[in-house]
């Protein structure tokens, strides 16, 4: 199971204070050093703890199968692309199994992944992804989130706007019965978006993976079977 953390817990690491380190950065470092999913990701070869979130989403909803075309929005550092590559059995030689990953930050190569280093919001980015797909996508997934500022309402709205943009793009490229996955932060303003998504997909669910930090308001919107 992806959430089997036996051997990764109960190894608390203290972080020494430093004049050069702010309180918030010290707290972040302490959380990273003591996060069992961070340790597990390092051992399992995943580039981020977020990989386990997608694995849990797949275990719950059975989204990925071989011979799929997948778009990964906001892919860096590549954890979700790694998971998708394994689940669809992607390779650099099989064009039927293809992942198009987009991020403004560079990511190291993943088997079966075509990486587009662009800002998703630039005018020509959508067309570049569509050309790279060479057809319709089976899954569009987005783990994009704005840089948080610690103000929950603002963080909620900013990430919701990213989700809305990803949703509008998904409608353009998904084939019928395709799936859409995206991160949102709970905060109340997401209801209008949910109504839009429900009009376009047969099944829409909310899911919070156990690998998502308990204090985080993030949840994942899982929209199944585009109409």
Swiss-Prot record:
EC number: 2.1.1.166
Gene Ontology CC terms: cytoplasm
Pfam families registered for this protein in UniProt: FtsJ
Location within or outside the cell: Cytoplasm
Binding of S-adenosyl-L-methionine, residues: 78, 80, 103, 119, 143
GO MF annotation, one: rRNA (uridine-2'-O-)-methyltransferase activity
Top-level class of the enzyme under EC nomenclature: transferase
Active site annotation, chain numbering: 183
First-listed, main subcellular location of the protein, grouped into a coarse class: cytoplasm
Alphabetic keyword roster: Cytoplasm, Methyltransferase, rRNA processing, S-adenosyl-L-methionine, Transferase
Gene3D superfamilies: Vaccinia Virus protein VP39 (3.40.50.150)
Key word ATP-binding present: no
Superkingdom of the organism of origin: Bacteria
Reactions catalysed according to its record: uridine(2552) in 23S rRNA + S-adenosyl-L-methionine = 2'-O-methyluridine(2552) in 23S rRNA + S-adenosyl-L-homocysteine + H(+)
InterPro entries recorded: RNA_methyltr_RlmE (IPR050082), RNA_MeTrfase_FtsJ_dom (IPR002877), rRNA-MeTfrase_E (IPR015507), SAM-dependent_MTases_sf (IPR029063)
Family: Belongs to the class I-like SAM-binding methyltransferase superfamily. RNA methyltransferase RlmE family.
HAMAP family in the record: RNA_methyltr_E
Biological function: Specifically methylates the uridine in position 2552 of 23S rRNA at the 2'-O position of the ribose in the fully assembled 50S ribosomal subunit.
Protein's name according to its UniProt entry: Ribosomal RNA large subunit methyltransferase E
Annotated source species: Rickettsia rickettsii (strain Sheila Smith)
Encoding gene per record: rlmE
């Amino acid at each position: 199971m992806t959430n089997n953390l036996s051997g990764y817990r109960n190894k608390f690491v203290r972080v020494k204070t430093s004049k050069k380190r702010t309180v918030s950065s010290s707290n972040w470092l302490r959380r990273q050093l003591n996060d069992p999913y961070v340790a597990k990701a390092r051992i399992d070869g995943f580039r981020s703890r977020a990989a386990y979130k997608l694995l849990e989403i797949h275990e719950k909803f059975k989204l990925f199968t071989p011979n799929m075309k997948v778009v990964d929005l906001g892919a860096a550092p590549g954890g979700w692309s790694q998971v998708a590559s394994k689940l669809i059995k992607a390779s650099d030689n099989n064009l039927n199994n293809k992942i198009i990953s987009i991020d403004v930050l560079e990511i190291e190569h993943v088997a079966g992944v075509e990486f587009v280093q662009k800002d998703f919001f630039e005018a020509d980015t959508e067309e570049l992804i569509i050309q790279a797909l060479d057809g319709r996508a089976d899954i569009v997934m987005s783990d994009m989130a704005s840089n948080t500022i610690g103000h929950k309402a603002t963080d909620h709205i900013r990430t919701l706007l990213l989700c809305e943009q990803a949703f509008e793009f998904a409608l353009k490229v998904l084939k019928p019965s395709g799936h859409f996955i995206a991160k949102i932060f709970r905060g109340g303003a997401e209801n209008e978006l949910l109504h839009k998504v429900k009009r376009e997909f047969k099944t829409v669910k909310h899911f919070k993976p156990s690998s998502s930090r308990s204090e985080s308001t993030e949840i994942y919107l899982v929209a199944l079977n585009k109409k």
